[in-house]
Swiss-Prot record:
Signal peptide, first to last residue: 1-22
Protein name per UniProt: Conotoxin TxMRCL-04
Family: Belongs to the conotoxin T superfamily.
Propeptide feature: residues: 23-46
Gene Ontology cellular-component terms listed: extracellular region
Tissue expression per record: Expressed by the venom duct.
GO MF assignments: toxin activity
Pfam family for this entry, one: Chi-conotoxin
Domain comment, as recorded: The cysteine framework is V (CC-CC).
Disulfide bond sites: none
PTM characteristics: Contains 2 disulfide bonds that can be either 'C1-C3, C2-C4' or 'C1-C4, C2-C3', since these disulfide connectivities have been observed for conotoxins with cysteine framework V (for examples, see AC P0DQQ7 and AC P81755).
């Protein structure tokens, strides 16, 4: 019975904490998906720009 009030208080504290979605975004925030898209685009440009036959995996052809 002593644990019940402590358990209820902990539940109330957990429920009152702000979620990640509640935080305001600034103009500097970038989603992780767009970051991955940028990395893919840069890697695709780099592989099509130059093809080094001596490095395995450098050339996409």
């Amino acid at each position: 019975m002593r644990c019940l009030p402590v358990f209820v208080i902990l539940l109330l504290l957990i429920a009152s904490t702000p979620s990640v979605d509640a935080q305001l975004k600034t103009k500097d925030d970038m989603s992780l998906a767009s970051f991955h898209d940028n990395v893919k685009r840069i890697l695709q440009i780099r592989t099509t720009e130059e093809c080094c036959p001596f490095i395995v995996g450098c050339c996409s052809r």
